[in-house]
Amino acid sequence: MLLNFTFKNFASFRDVQQFSMEIPSKENSEQWKYPELSTVTALYGANASGKSSFLAALWFVSSFVRDGYVSGVGESEIPRRGFLLDHLSATDASEFSIEMYAEDGYRYIYEFAVTDTTVEYEELTAYYSRRPSLLYSRNL
């Protein structure tokens, strides 16, 4: 179950964007497995306001996690779309963070940053209690 999704430097978004499924504590429902989370959300806005780019960022993370990336295979490129309207951002890494509850009931945060050809860093943190446990971290 998705809690938060954050990304930066992807498609039409240069700055940090955050999407949260968390709801105010006064509105929590005890009838739901995760009472602090909304069971439904809507994404709406004017034409050309970034709705499709937001969904593309979420899809990119999903495919990156599912399919992975093999470095050093020919001229392989990571199919990310950095912000192109700023020459500095076009070459900067795109950053992503997903906070979620997994099927085991624990909360996890997975973060990574990629350029067109490399994974700059990757980190997975689990919350088996109130304290975070770093499961792995790798930097280039």
Question: Language-model features: where?
Answer:
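Pre-Walker A-like glycine/lysine-rich segment at the N-terminus of P-loop NTPase domains
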Residues: 1-60
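Conserved beta-strand and immediately adjacent loop positions that scaffold enzyme active sites
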Residues: 4, 97, 121-123
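A generic structural motif
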Residues: 8-10, 99-103, 125-127
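Generic, ordered loop/turn and secondary-structure boundary motif
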Residues: 11-14, 22, 84, 120, ...
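A generic structural signal for short, non-catalytic loop/turn and secondary-structure boundary residues
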Residues: 12-14, 54, 91, 117, ...
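Glycine-rich loops and low-complexity Gly/Arg-rich segments
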Residues: 29-32, 42-47, 67-69, 122-125, ...
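Conserved P-loop NTP-binding catalytic core
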Residues: 36, 41-42, 55-116
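Electropositive, glycine-dotted interaction segments
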Residues: 107-140
